Amino acid sequence: HTFNVIIKIEGSINSNNDFVMDFFDIDDIFNKSIFKHLDHKFLNDIEGLSSPTTENVSIWIWNHLINELPLLSEVSVFEGELYGCTYKGD
């Protein structure tokens, strides 16, 4: 499968750089915490993803990002252009 992932953050704008968080930092965290574990892998073999539905993938990503990305507000995972799931840490 090929998934598209959207990461959303919420917070106050930093007066030093006018960002809530620099997208380069988000990208770096995503690549280190998520991408290297999922890219070109058989998802069923990954701990916690024995049933890799978009719902479960979004929760798995949330759980692996939240400690590194405390401003995380949503993780959306799409399979194709039209169908996906958004997890908000509920």
Ranges and model annotations:
Residues 1-90:
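Charge-rich, low-complexity N-terminal segments
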